[in-house]
Amino acid sequence: MNHSERFVFIAEWFDPNASLFRRYELLFYPGDGSVEMHDVKNHRTFLKRTKYEDLHLEDLFIGNKVNIFSRQLVLLDYGDQYTARQLGSKKEKTLALIKPDAVSKAGEIIEIINKAGFTLTKLKMMTLSRKEATDFHIDHQSRPFLNELIQFITSGPIIAMEILRDDAVCEWKRLLGPANSGLARTDAPESIRALFGTDGIKNAAHGPDSFACAAREMELFFPSSGVCGPANTAKFTNCTTCCIVKPHAVSEGLLGKILMTIRDAGFEISAMQMFNMDRINVEEFYEVYKGVVSEYNEMVTEMYSGPCVAMEIQQTNPTMTFREFCGPADPEIARHLRPGTLRAIFGKTKIQNAVHCTDLPEDGLLEVQYFFKILDN
């Protein structure tokens, strides 16, 4: 491995003390995983080259947020032509849509996406209005089956995702297989539609045909204008509790496995969305733990170190039941006392313990509202 090869990005950090944005040159050396930072305005070294294990090559793409020693940086642009050529030439984003018939198989589908080398950059479980469904199916306006398509896509929750990799549009279409699930079972038996679809309408998932089509469709589901797009699916009932898949688990590609484990234990995931939290949001959410839990600062840093996935969980007496299913906060203790729990299976340390869950019954609805009413808006 070439230890002198480096990739350069222009990055921005919001300084909460000065209430201004500071711009840096971020250098990443893939040979040894080290980073270096230069202050653009003052033309000086801000961080000398040092090893940093929590940043990986797949994290480096325009628009992503990365955490460098507790500073959350937004990657704005490539810093030199070499980086632009090497990392920007083939990277594409596309829309991956799980249809109502396959939402219960979201874990399996996300696992397939992860194993194919995609990075999941946005995710939201949502419901479409008839108008939103009509706008989505604009290319089928003259088709005789248009009404059937609209009725199906509005019949229940869907999961929209933005996924990223080289040649994303073509690779996602390959994973999907032929549009008709019956044909897919013959021609591409390992494809998503072959495994989880029924026919040409109820065919589990959707992918755009071109890069231009992907850009148009992603604008429908994840508008760049700042409006929140189609409505989330949160029910906000008294049978609600909150689960958050922590950034380290998302980064390690564990989301699909965690979703399958939750479903197989009999819990209903009634809402789900990916969030990129900032420190202020996390401190607000974790306020109840401040001064109570000794690892409070480390908990905060982990939760804004990358994207997390928040869920609304439904079951009778959900808070206590789901909390027991998550297991003790320390995964080592969980592996000894409760080996079948989420933290025992997927956790690493007391901070990187895979999931947060609501601790007190009276906080379940409040935590769900924080994500799906406040942050989503």
UniProtKB/Swiss-Prot annotation:
It is found in: Cytoplasm, Cytoskeleton, Microtubule organizing center, Centrosome; Nucleus; Cytoplasm; Cytoplasm, Cytoskeleton, Spindle. Pfam families: NDK, PH_NDK7_N. This is Nucleoside diphosphate kinase homolog 7. GO terms for cellular component: axonemal A tubule inner sheath; axonemal microtubule; centrosome; gamma-tubulin ring complex; nucleus; sperm flagellum; spindle. One of its GO terms (biological process) is GTP biosynthetic process. PANTHER family: NUCLEOSIDE DIPHOSPHATE KINASE 7. Expressed in trachea multiciliated cells. GO terms for molecular function: 3'-5' exonuclease activity; ATP binding; nucleoside diphosphate kinase activity. The keyword tRNA processing does not apply. Belongs to the NDK family. Disulfide bonds: none annotated. Its EC number is 3.1.-.-, 2.7.-.-.
